[in-house]
Amino acid sequence: MLSQCLSRTSRAVAGSNGHRFSKLSAIDGVHHAHPSPRRYTTFSSSDHADRTKRLLDAKEKAGLTYDKLASKLGITNTYAAQILLGQTKLSAATAAKLQAALPISEQDIEDMKSTYPMRGFDDEILKEPNVYRTYEAITHYGEAIKSIINEQCGDGIMSAIDFYCDVGTTTGVNGEKRVVITFNGKFLPHIEQKEEDNTAKSPRD
């Protein structure tokens, strides 16, 4: 009976967040599911993780901060971090600069240039306090931000595709270090769906 219950629980959890679970273990009498790497037809999270570790080790070996690496690559510091974390595709032009800046294998460079990344995130990351507080700030101020965007730009959204993000610091009035995050996204207005502009009308039986 217990094994059947655990089996049902494991399937339910796996279905809720996209993970597959390889086994269940008991800690203090409570059974915990251990996620196995996600697998996609063109993407392996274990390969991704191995490459990311090599890239971060190379960054540390080179003694570069993200700001210094970004300066060498001519990109924002968050985009430099995304490249190393496998959250964006590496362009040919930036690949040459990256290889000059860090001791990276030719195979890793080619894989980063040819792989279309899975840009989603594991829900587990929201348990990290730094990440969650950023998420909390955006959700807390979300309605106010939307209202101001609408007031200043009209009915639409800020793109996260035609988009720049930069992280920096400043000094507060009491001498404390403060974090500054800048989002610079293209405004995309919602369109009025006029029939004459619809080039792909659905068929009618």
From Swiss-Prot:
InterPro entries the record matches: Cro/C1-type_HTH, Cyanase, Cyanate_lyase_C, Cyanate_lyase_C_sf, Lambda_DNA-bd_dom_sf
Catalytic activity: cyanate + hydrogencarbonate + 3 H(+) = NH4(+) + 2 CO2
Disulfide bonds: none
Keywords: Lyase
SUPFAM superfamilies per record: Cyanase C-terminal domain, lambda repressor-like DNA-binding domains
GO molecular function terms listed in the Swiss-Prot or TrEMBL record: cyanate hydratase activity; DNA binding
Protein name: Cyanate hydratase
Organism: Thalassiosira pseudonana
